[in-house]
């Protein structure tokens, strides 16, 4: 289990040292290290969690497993090192699942986070994507508001992973080919079915609804015209120097 720092302050010297280590260990850091970027708050920083993630994957045995807390942006990134790592893990079929957590779930960061589960023995298996972003309840924690998962919330997530059953608007169970078709996205929401509800109406019911819509629109148009006239009238009364 790992909760690496996401984007800490990083000096040029620190970045140069990391770059030198990465260059000497291409097997451990096959996708290199993220660039040093300017930040108004801390000066310069780097998305160092991507370096930690590569190191963790390299450290695992052939049947190794890991749970890693990452910024939720990682699961949908379409470019850069983040996308390359995610694509690599999916191509290798080492992903077991992802839980996208509610906002403000951690005291140390306001960044939305997800937990990535890696299992090198999951080749040919299924992947569970769980959207827990709407779960839990908000409470005051000192000066900040945090969101807390209840024991029952936690059990729902655990049961979904263990049973590998999809839950409407909550979780999906996929094979790796399905994930590849969605540009390697690990966001559960991108796989939820879009439902369109249809209502059968009789001719009389249809006519009644249409008349109601027309009446409402006419009322809105009239209110808009009244407001427009009022504004124009007040503008006419404005004079320079008043």
Placement of each model-derived feature along the sequence:
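A conserved structural/catalytic subdomain of Rossmann-like adenosyl-cofactor enzymes
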Residues: 1-242
